[in-house]
Structure formats: C-alpha cells, structure tokens
Amino acid sequence: MATIIQAKDLRAGHTFLYKGNIYQVIENSFNKTAMREGIVKCKVKNLRTGAITIEVLTGEKLEQAVIEKSKMTFSYDDGSGYVFMDNDTYEQISIPYSQLSWEKNFIEEGTEVSVMRYDGELMGVSLPDQLVVTIIEAEEAVQGNSVQNATKRAWLESKWEFQVPQFIKSGEKVIINPSNGQYVGRAK
C-alpha cells in the first residue's frame, strides 16, 4: 500500500509522485496565513528528466515514492553518459547526461554515489553530503588583499566554477557541498 503524505510535511530529499512524474525535493518553504490553507513551495527535481522546477502544492495529498538506492562508483564517460560500477557484483550501468544535469559538475573518477531506482526504472544518482574534488585551475591570489574571507575563482575538471579562499592552489584537493556547489574546506 502506498504511503500518502501531506505537502506541508515534505522536506529536502523526500520523493513523491505528482502528475505522473517522480520528484525529489531540493528545497521547500511553507507559508501559513490566517484564515487560509498553508502554501507549500518546493524546488523539485524530476527524476525521470532531470529538470528542476518549482511546484506550488497547497493542501495536496501526495503518494510517497519509495526509491531503491545502491552504492556504485563512477568509472568513465562513454560519450553518451556516465558509466557506474557496482563494487560487489561488478555490474556496470550507463546513465545519460540528461539525468545528471547538476550532479555531473562534481563527479570525478572513483566518486562513490547512490544510484536510485523506482520500480526497476533508473532515476539517476544521489551524491554524498560532502565530496572531495581536485582543483584543476585557480586564479592567482591578490597580494595585499587582507579583507577577511577574501576569495578567488577556481575550476573543477567539469568546468564548474566556484569561490575558494585565497590560499587554495591548482592541483589541491578540497571538500565541497554538492547540493549547492560551494567550498567547505581543505581535504586532508
């Protein structure tokens, strides 16, 4: 029996069925005004297409989607998608670029991910809360810039650009938060 959840109870990471699609909540907000039903706005990812949209769900009752997750490691890019290998069975699967629109910015060789499936259908991957990545290129630090928390631009192999502290150099490994793509700290 499918579990029904109220829209107001949705949180980041929850998955649900809505209008024939499977969505995963990225962010949500709930506004309750007097004499009215609460308004739930969710930034969601369509797990079939990879599209990210905003859905307004006021008083909706939604069917929770039960997603199966299995740990896999990124092996290589086959030209049409990314190939992941199950560490236990050595099974390999290819996931099209379209299903990894955001995640592809942070996946490097050897990255461990959770591959998501719904009723046997491949839905994409879920990244860990923090990832260790390699800086391919970083701008030079500006001499004399003593502003607290001064940053500069840096790039990953995927061409993802983000801000890092002035002391980070090309070739260094850093920790990022893949949910927003921001620098967290130096890798040890």
Curated annotation (Swiss-Prot):
One of its GO terms (biological process) is peptide biosynthetic process. It is found in: Cytoplasm. SMART domains: EFP, Elong-fact-P_C. Pathway: Protein biosynthesis; polypeptide chain elongation. InterPro entries: Elong-fact-P_C, NA-bd_OB-fold, Rib_uL2_dom2, Transl_elong_fac_P/YeiP, Transl_elong_KOW-like, Transl_elong_P/YeiP_cen, Transl_elongation_fac_P, Translation_prot_SH3-like_sf. One of its GO terms (cellular component) is cytoplasm. GO terms for molecular function: translation elongation factor activity. Keywords: Cytoplasm, Elongation factor, Protein biosynthesis. Belongs to the elongation factor P family. Involved in peptide bond synthesis. Stimulates efficient translation and peptide-bond synthesis on native or reconstituted 70S ribosomes in vitro. Probably functions indirectly by altering the affinity of the ribosome for aminoacyl-tRNA, thus increasing their reactivity as acceptors for peptidyl transferase. This is Elongation factor P.
